[in-house]
């Protein structure tokens, strides 16, 4: 995508972006520092891509980062500066015909407005590759130029001999200039399923080499998208291109009359197997000015309608560390909400504390998010780091485990509440209306500090808790009665006994707690590790105390646990 296209699109969008997005609560000094850091990040990406042929981020993440830069500049009254991403791409060789940009259309309504009053409109896939000029002399391909800044590019003619998949000799000895896209050849590539996988960067990297080589060269194809000096009619241009050995230009181009047809073909190519990756569709009009008047900006006769983002750039607002029932610490990134495939995403899990430590993500960082299986938010990478690194209260993983936090003591509230949620959930006692919010209120009110305290709560105590009405108190008492009368098998599961499902139903707590590790290992499906876990569970002091209390409350299966607890 050209600098001029990006600049036009970004300047068009910056007002609406700023209105839709909240500005960071930064001092003037911090704003200046953070904006400078983002500019430096973008400049580094530009240099790697255009000069070294290395794409450090996906194109859509790059665009979103530039949007974010303009938003920050407006937030803090800074002058709009968008240094050309092609600053290091300009080459020494002038193009015979300038490469234009394309106007970017963001939705079906914008497509309809663009098509209003236009005749002879065609649609074709927007091939995701590297733009080039091809110069034929007497029918032979003699020059291959990188797009550069649209006016001047680098000479890639040294690679012509290795590009076996490209027509290097026309049927007639003609002098012709073509413009097109060098792409990575793929087999039955479905964009909606596979995405682009950085194929553009792969091709750019190969072409940046001093020598390409036959094997890499054979993996590169060409999609010709313009013949600047060709006939006025697009259909005639495509027919002649096919006769010269460029059939894909005709095969993947369709004349349309309505925005609905544009929508149809965009969706069709998005979900159909193609020989190349794409990132949208191109709309072009038959009528255009003479080639000598073309400029490297977005003209009126070409527009792009890109596909939905496969990755979204999201700002981290908060890093939370969730502690589950078993003591596992899971970092959770709270995000400034973004939309992917019509899904609003405001948080994503990092999976493990070790992963967070390796990534060191802090509030203010920009991260890439995608959807796993088209539904589950997935963290992909850190895209940009904030200059200011906030200090976070990070839990020590060693403090938590299977036998920690059986009570609501300091530093234990979260794991303890998770134990209560599990106990009362469908996998345990199946007590209606006792979710995390209810238990949190009771714990914070000091009414529930152990796993058995709820068994003795009365209506008056429940009504003293903020947020619990008389109706809710009555419902909770009914739910507590249900839990109290559940059979032992459900209590066993709710307390988290690490026993397999095939433990005999008629066994009680005293029988289970009386087994040694070697006794457990004689049962089907229990190995040495599980046997040790079971023995440790039943001999844990806190677990024994809970069992004793349940026995005194008359809970099924816990009679006689006083003796077990004193062993």
UniProtKB/Swiss-Prot annotation:
InterPro entries: DNA_ligase_B, DNA_ligase_CS, DNAligase_adenylation, DNAligase_N, NA-bd_OB-fold, NAD_dep_DNA_ligaseB, NAD_DNA_ligase_OB, RuvA_2-like. The active site is at residue 126. Keywords: DNA damage, DNA repair, DNA replication, Ligase, NAD. It catalyses: NAD(+) + (deoxyribonucleotide)n-3'-hydroxyl + 5'-phospho-(deoxyribonucleotide)m = (deoxyribonucleotide)n+m + AMP + beta-nicotinamide D-nucleotide. Pfam families: DNA_ligase_aden, DNA_ligase_OB, HHH_5. HAMAP family: DNA_ligase_B. Catalyzes the formation of phosphodiester linkages between 5'-phosphoryl and 3'-hydroxyl groups in double-stranded DNA using NAD as a coenzyme and as the energy source for the reaction. It comes from Pseudomonas putida (strain W619). Its EC number is 6.5.1.2. NCBIfam families: PRK08097.1 (NF005987). One of its GO terms (biological process) is DNA repair. This is DNA ligase B. Belongs to the NAD-dependent DNA ligase family. LigB subfamily. GO terms for molecular function: DNA ligase (NAD+) activity.
């Amino acid at each position: 995508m050209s600098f001029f296209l990006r600049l036009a699109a970004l300047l068009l969008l910056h007002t609406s972006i700023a209105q839709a997005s909240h500005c960071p609560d930064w001092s003037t000094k911090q704003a200046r520092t953070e904006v400078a850091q983002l500019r430096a990040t973008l400049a580094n990406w530009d240099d790697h891509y255009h000069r070294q042929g290395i794409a450090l981020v996906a194109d859509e993440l790059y665009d979103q980062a530039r949007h974010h830069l303009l938003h920050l500049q407006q937030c803090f009254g800074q002058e709009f500066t968008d240094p050309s991403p092609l600053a290091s791409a300009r080459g020494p060789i002038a193009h015979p015909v300038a490469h234009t940009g394309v106007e970017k259309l963001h939705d079906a309504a914008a497509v309809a407005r663009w098509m209003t009053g236009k005749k002879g409109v065609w649609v074709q896939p927007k091939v995701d590759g590297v733009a080039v000029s091809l110069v034929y002399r007497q029918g032979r391909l003699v020059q291959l130029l990188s797009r550069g800044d649209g006016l001047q590019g680098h000479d890639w003619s040294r690679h012509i001999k290795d590009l076996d998949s490209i027509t290097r000799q026309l049927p007639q000895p003609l002098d012709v200039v073509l413009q097109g896209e060098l792409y990575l050849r793929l087999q039955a590539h479905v964009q909606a399923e596979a995405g682009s996988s950085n194929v553009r960067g792969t091709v750019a990297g190969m072409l940046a080499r001093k020598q390409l080589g036959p094997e890499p060269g054979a993996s590169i194809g060409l999609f010709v998208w313009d013949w600047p000096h060709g006939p006025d009619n697009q259909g005639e241009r495509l027919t002649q291109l096919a006769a010269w050995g460029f059939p894909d230009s005709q095969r993947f181009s369709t004349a349309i009359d309505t925005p609905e047809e544009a929508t149809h073909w965009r969706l069709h190519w998005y979900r159909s197997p193609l020989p190349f990756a794409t990132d949208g569709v191109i709309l072009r009009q038959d009528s255009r000015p003479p080639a000598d008047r073309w400029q490297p900006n977005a003209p009126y006769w070409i527009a792009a309608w890109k596909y939905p983002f496969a990755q979204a750039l999201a700002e981290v607002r908060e890093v939370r560390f969730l502690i589950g029932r078993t003591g596992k610490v899971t970092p959770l990134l709270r995000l400034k909400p973004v939309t992917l495939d019509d899904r609003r995403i405001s948080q994503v899990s990092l999976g493990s504390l070790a992963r967070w430590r390796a990534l060191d993500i802090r509030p203010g960082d920009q991260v890439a998010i995608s959807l796993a299986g088209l539904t589950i938010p997935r963290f992909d990478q850190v895209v940009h780091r904030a200059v200011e690194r906030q200090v976070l209260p990070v839990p020590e993983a060693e403090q938590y485990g299977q036998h920690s936090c059986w009570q609501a003591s300091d530093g234990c509230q979260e794991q303890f509440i998770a134990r209560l949620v599990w106990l009362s959930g469908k996998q345990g006692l199946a007590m209606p209306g006792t979710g995390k919010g209810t238990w949190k209120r009771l714990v914070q009110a000091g009414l529930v500090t152990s796993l058995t305290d709820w068994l003795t709560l009365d209506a008056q105590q429940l009504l003293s808790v903020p947020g619990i009405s008389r109706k809710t108190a009555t419902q909770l008492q009914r739910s507590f009665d249900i839990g109290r009368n559940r059979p032992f098998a459900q209590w066993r599961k709710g307390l988290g006994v690490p026993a397999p499902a095939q433990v005999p139903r008629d066994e009680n707590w005293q029988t289970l707690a009386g087994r040694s590790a070697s006794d457990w290992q004689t049962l089907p499906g229990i190995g040495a590790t599980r046997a040790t876990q079971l023995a440790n569970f039943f001999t844990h002091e806190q677990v024994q105390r809970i069992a004793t209390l349940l026995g005194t409350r008359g809970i099924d299966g816990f009679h006689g646990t006083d003796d077990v607890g004193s062993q």
